[in-house]
From Swiss-Prot:
<protein>
    <recommendedName>
        <fullName>Putative uncharacterized protein B8J22.070</fullName>
    </recommendedName>
</protein>
Length: 140
């Protein structure tokens, strides 16, 4: 699989179907390969509907425990909140039958996903304060 390395400020992360490994290149954002099959099964089934379009999924779906989650994203939640003041586009490779590349937005200033689709048309997943909001399209 080809990996597109970009400057760390863009912060692209890929999650692929393999054993958990961390790949880093000096000056570039980390690319993490992490098996997250449970997200498509247990994670989404536990999620709550919030707003008209999004499913709220606890971030624990990405791993067992906070440290696992933070390592998976390559930055701690505190670092994210400190370094990102505006909504920032990220990408996640969500493992499922179709290997969907998800458009993922970290939106630190919004507490709910109610108006997210209106603000970012086409967004399939949005991260807000420790929760991931997934569009129902991701459930298919």
């Amino acid at each position: 699989m080809m990996v597109d390395y970009r400057p760390a400020s863009i912060m692209d992360f890929l999650f692929v179907d393999s054993k958990a490994k961390r790949h880093t290149t000096p000056g570039y954002s980390p690319v993490v390969t992490e098996p997250i099959a449970d997200l498509a099964v247990t994670g989404l089934s536990r999620g709550e509907r919030t707003g008209p379009d999004f499913i709220q999924v606890p971030m624990v779906a990405f791993g067992r425990g906070t440290q696992v989650q933070e390592k998976a994203f390559g930055l701690t939640l505190q670092q994210l909140k400190r370094n990102i003041s505006e909504p920032t586009s990220l990408k996640l490779w969500i493992r499922d039958k179709n290997k969907v590349l998800v458009h993922y937005i970290y939106a630190p200033v919004y507490q709910s996903a109610t108006n997210i689709q209106e603000r970012w048309p086409g967004a399939l997943a949005v991260r807000c304060y420790g929760h991931l909001y997934l569009h129902p399209q991701m459930l298919r």
